Amino acid sequence: LFGSFRFDEEKISFGELGKTEKASLVTYSLSKTMLRLTKNVALPTLRCFSSRITIDNINQKIRTADYAVRGEVVIRAIEIDNEMKKGKKFPFDSLLYCNVGNPQAIKQKPITFLREVLCITSWPEVADKHPEMFHPDALQRAKELLAANPGGSGAYSNTAGVPKVCEDVAKYIEKRDGFPCDPANIFLTNGASQGIQDTLKLLIDKPTDCILIPIPQYPLYSASIHIFGGQYEPYYLNEKNDWALDAKDIEKSIQSARAKGLTVKAIAAVNPGNPTGKCFSRQNIEDICKICARENIVILADEVYQENIYRPGDKFISFKKVMSELKLNCQLVSFHSTSKGYWGECGRRGGYLEMVNFPNDVRAELYKLLSICCCSNVDGQYTMDVMINPPKPGDASYELFEKEKNGILDSLKIRAKKLSTALNKLDGVSCLSVDGALYTYFRLTMPPKAIEAAKKMGKAADLMYCMDLLNEAGVVCVPGSGFGQEEGTYHVRSTILPPMNEIDQVVERMNNFHKKWMAKYQ
């Protein structure tokens, strides 16, 4: 009766406190009804009515959500880093972070043209005082962006974003796919993650609403769906077939979800793949589009790694291009980001989403949802404009831009090859080639003793492996159990982002650690 009642001190009188810390609750008011108690009430009883926040009365969906990319291994890495700064000794002299796709955190240099533009948009006076510091095309782009948002980067933009940037994104999509794109369907977001989360908020209405997610998956999806009160149903990518998908498996997942009484609202498709490092074939994309058109399921096309394709002859194909060529009336939301590719501007939080084949009233509701946060950050919007509209042949910055871009992409290809080749030489390790994105995702054949030891610790065996790799070798990776995997299999995700000299260290440390670890559990 009283569990949710907040006491008003003016309506409560207490007797004297005795040694037993009891108070006599004389009167209080509840719902306009005066009640009287004459018995003593222990203070702990009074405290139970308090509104003080504890771990037990916060949103339990947040408490039970998992996000392995910044989970237990990373928390321990932060502890080690702090201990090292205080002088504590470890078997290594530095940590090698291979856990998250955050390029500039591990020494990737930013693209000069972008930084020149952002410097000017943040401090326009510097261009007046020292124009010689900047390339002419950077000066011109900054001038255009400042004019497009009155007040500059320190002022709110329109909810959907600076109109010029939305228009430039639409032109970029039209050029990429060869089909029209309406700027009214473009929404600029704080990274792709916000766009994905807000789209999920829009779609999930009831506890029985379901999103299909790939396994292995990027845990943004499972965590967000859980917190927003929906359900997810896995569809498995086939490791034996280069992490390709099978249309029959998607259809089985749809049937499985519906058999549970769930309403399948959407399917998440990540291409190129995180964590797999693989690209969907055109046939894979066609299969998803056809199924979704037939079943009235929204496609959530996570395409943030579209510039990260390494296999010779491969080229990115968007879901919008395929469904348009097939003349399918699918409902599609596609996402892109400034954080990946060769830009690596994670901290700028630039992103966009495009809604395709949604009615205007639904689009208006997404606009309202985004309006609650006013707009995405304007520096991120400017970054997006530069990313989708970089220097062109003949521009003053073009030669330097091409040199920087190709240098980054070529280096990523080399590092991907070097790391995957080294991993395949380890006993019990199988690593498919890295054809896209920023990760190797290797499979571990665990000794039975290792699996048993992990069970005794209450941990997944690949989590135990990653914790040992961190504590003994200083390499920070993410266990496959955090992405989902077929029962009885174990995986580890490592980025390919450490610079070349550190990739060599990663290879050496992992090689030495792995040999000792496997010998320990043979």
Language model region names:
Residues 112, 118-294, 306-329, 333-334, ...:
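Conserved core of the PLP fold type I
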Residues 56, 104-107, 112, 401-413, ...:
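Conserved PLP-binding catalytic core of the aspartate aminotransferase-like
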Residues 73, 98, 169, 186, ...:
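Generic structural signal for small/hydrophobic residues in well-ordered secondary structure
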Residues 48-160, 171, 297, 381, ...:
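N-terminal "arm"/small-domain region of PLP-dependent enzymes with the aminotransferase-like
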Residues 49-51, 55, 113-116, 136-144, ...:
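Conserved core segment of the aminotransferase class I/II
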Residues 88-89, 95-97, 335, 430-435, ...:
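Short beta-strand
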Residues 99, 438-457, 473-507:
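Conserved PLP-binding active-site segment of the aspartate aminotransferase-like
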Residues 21-53:
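N-terminal mitochondrial targeting presequence
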